[in-house]
C-alpha cells in the first residue's frame, strides 16, 4: 500500500496543480470581466428628496372689505370656478338707496351751479352741461331743471325791478335838474333886466327925477332874485348828487349780487366735489356687491352657508385653490447635494398618496433653486428648497387623479451618469482624501 502511494504521488500533485491553475485563470477572468463591466457600465444616478405639493400663487382667500348681508350664495364646497366668476352677491338695498340719495343731491348741485354761472355772467338763460337723467329719473330731472329756471327768472326779475326803481328815481331827478336849470335861466334873465333898469333909475335918481323908494325897490328885487338863484343852484346840485348816488346804488346792486353768487358758487363747487367722491365710493361699493373668484380653481373651507347671513369686514369667506396645472412641488434638498442641482434639470416625481403599482411617475423639471439654505425651526435640519414644475403632458398620465396642495411627494433629481466602479470606490477615495489631510 505504501509503495502504491509513493508510486502515484507525483501524478496527484500534477493534477492538483492543473486544477489550481484552472481555478486561478477562471478567477482572473471573472475579476477582469466584472471589473471591465464595473468600469464601463454607467448607471443613472439621482438625488432623492422629499417634497410637498404647493400652489404657485398660493391659496387665495376670498374676503370683503366692508362686509354686508348675503343676498345670494352661488357656490358650494368643492365647486370648480373660473376667475371673475360671482361667488356671493350681497344684498344691495341700503347701498342702492344711499347711491340714489347721493346722485339726486348731486343733480341738484349741478343744476344750481349752471344757474349761478349764468347769473354771474348776466346771461338771459342757462343750460346744464351734465345729463341729469343719468342721476335721477327723467321726470324728476325735468322738474328740477324747471324749478331752477323759475328761480333764475325770478331772481333776474327781482334784480331788474330794483334797478328799474332806481332808474325811475334817477329820471325824476334828471327832470328836477332840468326844471331847476330853466328856473335859473329865468332868474338870470330877470337879474339882467333889473340891472339895466337899475342903471337907468340911478341916473334919474341922481337928477332928482325919481324917488329913492324906486331905487330901493329895484335893489330889493335884485337881492331876492339872487337869493332864489342861489337856492336853485343848491337844489340842482343836490339833485345831481342824488342821481350820482343812484348810479352807485345800481353798481352796488350788481356788486352785491356778484359777491353773493360767487359765495354760493364756491359752496356749490365744494359740495359737488364732496358728493362726486361720495358717488365714486358708493358706486365702488355697489360694484363690490358681487364677490368674485380671484383665480380659477376649486372652492374649499366655505364659511357662508345661508342667505341673509352677515359678513364681517375682512372675514375669510372661502378659499380658492388652483388646480393641478397651477401646482408645483417644493422639495427639500440636503446641503451636500445642492452643488449638483441646476435649473432645468429633469426630475421624476412619485406621489406617495396614490397607488404606486398603478400610478406612473410624473416627469418634471427644476424651475427655481433657493439662493440660501433654510433651517426647519421644528427639527433644526437645514436644507435648500427647490421648486419643481410637473410637465402638463406627463400630468395627463394620472388619468383623472387630482393633485391638491399639501400632498406628499418623492422626487428623483437626475444628475450625471456614473460607472459602477465609481460607486464602489467613492467611499474609499473619500476616506483616503480625508486621511491625507490629517495633521
UniProtKB/Swiss-Prot annotation:
Keyword Membrane set for record: yes
BP terms from Gene Ontology: protein transport; transmembrane transport
InterPro entries in the record: MFP, T1SS_HlyD
Annotated Gene3D superfamilies: 2.40.30.170, 2.40.50.100
GO cellular component: plasma membrane
Transmembrane annotation, as ranges: 20-40
Keyword flag RNA-binding: no
Subcellular location: Cell inner membrane
Matches recorded under PANTHER family: ALKALINE PROTEASE SECRETION PROTEIN APRE, MEMBRANE FUSION SUBUNIT OF EMRAB-TOLC MULTIDRUG EFFLUX PUMP
Oligomeric form and interacting partners: Part of a type I secretion system composed of PrsD and PrsE.
Homology family: Belongs to the membrane fusion protein (MFP) (TC 8.A.1) family.
Protein name: Type I secretion system membrane fusion protein PrsE
Organism the protein comes from: Rhizobium meliloti (strain 1021) (Ensifer meliloti)
Gene: prsE
Amino acid at each position: 500500500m505504501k509503495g502504491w502511494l509513493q508510486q502515484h504521488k507525483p501524478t496527484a500533485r500534477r493534477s492538483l496543480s492543473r486544477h489550481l491553475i484552472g481555478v486561478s485563470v477562471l478567477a482572473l477572468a471573472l475579476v477582469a470581466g466584472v471589473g471591465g463591466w464595473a468600469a464601463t457600465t454607467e448607471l443613472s444616478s439621482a438625488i432623492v428628496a422629499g417634497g410637498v405639493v404647493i400652489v404657485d400663487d398660493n391659496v387665495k382667500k376670498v374676503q370683503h372689505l366692508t362686509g354686508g348681508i348675503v343676498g345670494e350664495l352661488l357656490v358650494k364646497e368643492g365647486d370648480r370656478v373660473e376667475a371673475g366668476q360671482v361667488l356671493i352677491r350681497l344684498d344691495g338695498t341700503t347701498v342702492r338707496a344711499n347711491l340714489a340719495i347721493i346722485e339726486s343731491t348731486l343733480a341738484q348741485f349741478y343744476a344750481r351751479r349752471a344757474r349761478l354761472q349764468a347769473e354771474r355772467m348776466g346771461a338771459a338763460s342757462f343750460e346744464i352741461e351734465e345729463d341729469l337723467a343719468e342721476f335721477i329719473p327723467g321726470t324728476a330731472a325735468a322738474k328740477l331743471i324747471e324749478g331752477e329756471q323759475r328761480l333764475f327768472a325770478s331772481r333776474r326779475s327781482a334784480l331788474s325791478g330794483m334797478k328799474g326803481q332806481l332808474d325811475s328815481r334817477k329820471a325824476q331827478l334828471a327832470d328836477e335838474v332840468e326844471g331847476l336849470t330853466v328856473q335859473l335861466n329865468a332868474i338870470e334873465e330877470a337879474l339882467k333886466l333889473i340891472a339895466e333898469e337899475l342903471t337907468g333909475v340911478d341916473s334919474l335918481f341922481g337928477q332928482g327925477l325919481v324917488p329913492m323908494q324906486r331905487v330901493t325897490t329895484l335893489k330889493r328885487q335884485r337881492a331876492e332874485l339872487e337869493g332864489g338863484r342861489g337856492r336853485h343852484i343848491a337844489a340842482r346840485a343836490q339833485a345831481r348828487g342824488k342821481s350820482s348816488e343812484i348810479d352807485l346804488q345800481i353798481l352796488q346792486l350788481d356788486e352785491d349780487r356778484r359777491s353773493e353768487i360767487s359765495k354760493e358758487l364756491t359752496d356749490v363747487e365744494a359740495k359737488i366735489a364732496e358728493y362726486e367722491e361720495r358717488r365714486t365710493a358708493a358706486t365702488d361699493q355697489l360694484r363690490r356687491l358681487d364677490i368674485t373668484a380671484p383665480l380659477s380653481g376649486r372652492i374649499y373651507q366655505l364659511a357662508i352657508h345661508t342667505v341673509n347671513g352677515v359678513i364681517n369686514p375682512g372675514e375669510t369667506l372661502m378659499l380658492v385653490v388652483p388646480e393641478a396645472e397651477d401646482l408645483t412641488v417644493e422639495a427639500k434638498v440636503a446641503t451636500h447635494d445642492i452643488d449638483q442641482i441646476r435649473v432645468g434639470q429633469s426630475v421624476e416625481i412619485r406621489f406617495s398618496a396614490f397607488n404606486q403599482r398603478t400610478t406612473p411617475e410624473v416627469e418634471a423639471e427644476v424651475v427655481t433653486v433657493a439662493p440660501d439654505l433654510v433651517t426647519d425651526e421644528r427639527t433644526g435640519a437645514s436644507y435648500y428648497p427647490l421648486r419643481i414644475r410637473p410637465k402638463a403632458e406627463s400630468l395627463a398620465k394620472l388619468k383623472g387623479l387630482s393633485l391638491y396642495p399639501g400632498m406628499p411627494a418623492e422626487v428623483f433629481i437626475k444628475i450625471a451618469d456614473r460607472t459602477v466602479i465609481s460607486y464602489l470606490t467613492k467611499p474609499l477615495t473619500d476616506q483616503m482624501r480625508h486621511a491625507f489631510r490629517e495633521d
